[in-house]
A protein has these predicted regions:
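Beta-rich, blade/repeat-based domains predominating
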Residues: 6-21, 49-68, 73, 90-109, ...
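Loop/turn-rich, solvent-exposed surfaces of beta-rich toroidal or solenoidal domains
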Residues: 175, 179-180, 192, 196-240
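A short loop-to-beta-strand structural motif that recurs across blades of beta-propeller domains
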Residues: 33-35, 73-75, 138-141, 180-182, ...
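Beta-propeller fold detector
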Residues: 44-48, 84-88, 151-155, 191-199, ...
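A short helix->beta-strand "capping" segment at the edge of beta-propeller domains
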Residues: 1-8, 288-289
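Short loop/turn segments that connect beta-strands within beta-propeller blades
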Residues: 37-42, 78-82, 144-148, 185-189, ...
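Short loop/turn segments immediately following the C-termini of beta-strands
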Residues: 27-29, 69, 114-116, 176, ...
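Short, conserved, GDST-rich strand-edge loop motifs in beta-rich repeat architectures
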Residues: 112-135
Length: 289
């Protein structure tokens, strides 16, 4: 393990660009920005302040897609910092907490909405004491860039969070409150089935813990950051836990695979505010763009 960079305020949404630079979001209310970090981790620059940006994705045109959670929306952003609101709603319903985001194999944008507003769930930057009593209607949204249509692929999740497409090109979404990872029957959603669960039965903390951002490697393993549990849990292609990579802090929020050939993951962690790099047996599954 090595520290790639530090002094980040609640980092999330890492994306490694083709030149090896790293995009991250900083959720802390004092920053609320998207930051670009040099490939060696030594320098960084502010791209844009959007409020409380959460997840990021980059499409084939180089457009940065942002799940913005403070003023709930899906944004389009350039490296010059110019942003455009793409969506405030899905199927006419206002977004509550756009959390994570990815590009699908069909070129559409897929977004998890955690199903509760940031202001209702958080006390400052951290979950409020009675978070478990809140009503949650986590949703999965799809935005068709060609026709401009939006629709819900699923709803009723207990804090929809991480989202990814697997080597089978179907959709996977996790649910923070239960620890569950779900697999859908097709790229367009459809029937939901339990793929696996990342909660460690030997972990005795009563604080919030559950899956956050996740990515697949090229050999079909799924790497899931587990907020509050302090690890990246690795599942095999059948959904079985095969490894737990302990992180330096207890609040990892997301990860990205390093450049091709590096066999590394970049893990962003909130408690200590840094990016940690770990070796892996394979490169990441190439992301759809």
């Amino acid at each position: 393990m090595r520290i790639f960079c530090d002094d980040l305020l609640l980092p999330e949404g890492p994306v490694v660009l083709d030149d090896g630079t790293l995009l991250v979001t900083e959720l802390g209310l004092d920053r609320g920005c998207i930051t670009l970090i040099a490939a060696d981790g030594a320098t960084r620059r502010l791209i844009a302040k959007t409020g409380r940006p959460n997840g990021l994705a980059v499409d084939r045109e180089g457009t940065i897609w942002v799940a913005e959670s403070l003023e709930p929306s899906v944004l389009r952003l350039g490296l010059d910092g110019e942003s455009v609101v793409h969506a405030l709603a899905c199927e006419g319903e206002l977004l509550l907490w756009p959390n994570d985001i990815c590009v699908g194999p069909d070129g559409a944008i897929y977004v998890t909405d955690s199903g509760v507003s940031v202001t209702d769930f958080l006390d400052g930057d951290w979950p409020r004491a009675d978070y478990a009593s809140l009503h949650l209607d986590g949703r999965v949204c799809r935005y068709d860039l060609g026709g401009g249509e939006s629709r819900f692929l699923d709803r009723g999740l207990q804090f929809a969070n991480g989202i990814a497409f697997g080597p089978d090109e179907v959709l996977y979404v996790n649910e923070t409150m239960t620890g569950n990872i779900y697999r859908y029957e097709s790229v367009a959603g459809g029937r939901r089935e339990l793929f696996g669960n990342v909660l460690d039965p030997d972990h005795d903390s009563r604080d919030l813990r559950g899956p956050d951002g996740m990515k697949f490697d090229a050999e079909g393993r799924l790497y899931v950051t587990v907020f509050g549990q302090g690890d990246v849990t690795v599942l095999d292609g059948c959904g079985r836990v095969i490894d737990r990579i302990a992180t330096q802090g207890k609040a990892p929020t997301n990860l990205a695979f390093g450049p091709a050939g590096s066999r590394t993951i970049y893990v962003v962690e909130d408690e200590r505010g840094h990016v940690e790099v770990y070796g892996t047996p394979a490169d990441g599954l190439p992301l759809h763009r």
